[in-house]
Amino acid sequence: MRSGCILVGALFLALFLGLPASGGDVAFTQKPMVVKQADKTAITFAVSTPTDVEVAVLDKDDKVVRHLAAGVLGANRNPPEPLQPGLSQSVAWDGKDDLGKPVTDGPLKVRVRIGMTAKFGRFIGQDPYIFGGVDSLVTGDDGNLYVSGFSGPANECQKTLRVFSPEGKFLKTLLPFPADLPAGAMKDVARWDEEAKAWRPRNLSNLNPDFYESSNGYGLYKVLSASKQQGVLFVGAAGKLYRIGLDGGIPGPAFLIAGKRAWPSDKEWPKADEIAQALGYHQGPVRYGISPDGKWLCLSGPFPTKDRATPQIPLGSIWRMRLDGPDTKMTTLAVVPATPDGTWGKEGGKNYDSSGPIHGIAVDLKGNVYVCDRDKDRVVVFDDAGKEIGEIPAKNPDVVAVHPKTGAIYVIRRFCNGWNTHSMVLDKFNGYGKDARPVASFAKFHRNNWPQMAVAVNGARTLLWFAGVAADDAKLATHEQPRKLFVLEDKGNEFQAVDLAFGPQSDGQADFARIASDPLREEVYVSNGENLIYRYDGDTGEGGLLRKDGKPFFAPDLAVGYDGLLYVRSGQGYSGPLERLTHDLAPVPYPATDSNKLYDIYGRYGIGFCEKGVGVGPDGKVYECWMYDFAKYFVSGWGPDGMPLAGKYLTQKLKSSKPVWTDVKLPEDRRVGSAIIGPVFSENGGIRVDLKGNLYVGLRVQPQGYVPPAGFEKDPAYGSFTGSVVKFGPEGGAVLAADLADSKSEDPKAPRLPTNKAGTVLEGALMMYPGVAPFSGSGFGGNTSCCVCRVSRFDLDRYGRLALPNVVSTSVRVVDNAGNVICEFGKYGNFDSQYVSPDNADGKPINATPDIPLCWPTGVGFTEKAIYVCDTYNRRVVRVDLTWKAEEIRDIK
């Protein structure tokens, strides 16, 4: 059994260092007894040592009809009611179900469990061939294909480097790094926690997962080469060079190669010399070519804007540096004569991504350099001294590559055929010269191409791999970029399209951002962060894109109610309706309005669509956190009849809000005129409602005096990214803070909780549960104070237990309603951890470390059997099965 819960016995550690409360051998010292007393049933039992317990009433089908109690016994904090302090318990049942209805359909049973543990269940939605839009690809000297994936919808990005065989079969993931590397292997990228036996990646961004290089969550570095001698080289903005080993570790002192910059200046812009200033904002593409022996790196494409022009960088400049020598920057190799108003910048020759007189570059075995000269419609060839030695006629050349053995030259010619679309032709030449003519060509490409090319040689077979390219019969929207790689085999005098092992599922989920579970059906809903939702069977893993009438059902977010209905923020846009639907997506009207639509919700986007969450109570009340003005948030509510709930807060402010009141085309009694909770910080995420009607909201704030878990006390990411789930009573509340607009107390008698933020208290708050992350915003790893679109999603079960994901600790913590830690599971692992390739006959995973792998867990969902974790970086859901150290069942007689 793969067990993932950390179990210790010291309760002080449990409460203050973030470790679970159970420890040692847990057993019943008094097994459960069930005694009927008039209209109640008494359940008594006792346990041997401090541990968590769970008490439930089961129906004749062994389904839970009443979640009676769950919590930690023997902790410093008292357990949540109806449990009492101490290891001996007596819990009464009033004969009703969770919703207060009498339970009459017997026979009935009581189940008591102690000592929750967790074990790996399964993966859902994963695909080794889906890892973001490809930003670069190369072939290594081992013949394998190294592919860097990155982009997702609406700025959701996570850098991934995967390795594939020459035939396109998935082999392994190198970035993010494997979990089984030896301590010390990751240098500045991650620290080894010897006590936890786990890696702790450094987190550089709260917007997107980024362990390696800080660019506000955008991994701007691209793969240059892969070899046994140099490992995998990357180049980033302004020529910064990076390296990892072929095992995924960091072979040098750091990920960044210090003292070398693949750029005409080794100075940091803007504190720079004239060249760095001139290229700080440049035009043209940035194209690199590396020599087959890995010694030389060449650059072509960039040139200064007119207002930054300098004689030191003539138009058409080509640069070069020695990678294995003392060079600290690139120097000019040659200058291709070019005109600033040439055909390269006009319709037909212009590229919409970036255009210049000089585009692609490549180096052959002799050190000759091949450059795409779009100004003169040719590929020009220089020797290793920078002397022009030949050319190849080619209209609009964009990309060039040289066969590493035969010296054959492959040229992509690219043409603008409309707004932001480009057609292309591939030509093969056996040599250069003014009279050179293609010996093979291929033109059956889709009309929209953004090509990258890598030449792979496997014995006598030569394959050309393309990213951003599709065949002419591909069913793509006008500006849709292809997800699959495209492969051509060089057959000598012709190219032949090849269908190889590399193939993502046509309808596979590309990004994983938000999650909601359906405990009644053991299903899980996962958003791509924009407007697509996928539904999966938790037991089988089967499922896919949510559809209605055969077409994609667009929705940024949803919650599953206690009644099993779906409460959906629907539509294609980041603003749109909040409505109630059946499991089959049919409307369910409200009695007071005769409509299933509650309201039009004012939203926004940044890193995906900025959906803050929907919550549904047992009585059918619905809550949504949204904006009443840009980046100003509140929680509103609607009753089970569909009418707005009256709150105490923001009454005057909301009635002057355009998106909430003045622009709403509804009768006044249907308009939202007050906040149940508000205002709240813009850094918020997730809403849940318990069986008593209490509201739980995720906020980027921590309790007063909060101390991070051991090892994270000085981690700037933990302190900045991590917030708390705040429990408010049914009456709601507000965040009271001097720096929060429209903050005002409306109930001086309401309970208040102090926070670790000076001058900030939470009115109406009953409890805080710290440890949930990420919350994006300003500060370390953030962008601006309004860049708050990346949020975590906690969950709450019917026992009142909370599951709190944290991307910094790469774990999920389960706590009872009093805040006692029950269990914590998950350790760092990349995609390969516990992944079993379908081609693996022995059924063993690529990497068996750790037991429950998580890379950047942003959300969770409870069911009766499991906790489902949305692992954003690994692009999958991890099902974690819940088990117990002991369980007893008794009949109710």
Can you name each region flagged by the protein language model?
Residues 1-3, 20, 353:
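Intrinsically disordered, low-complexity segments
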Residues 1-9, 884:
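Bacterial N-terminal signal peptides that target proteins for export
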Residues 22-893:
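Eukaryotic scaffold repeat domains enriched in small/polar residues
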Residues 7-18:
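Bacterial N-terminal signal peptides
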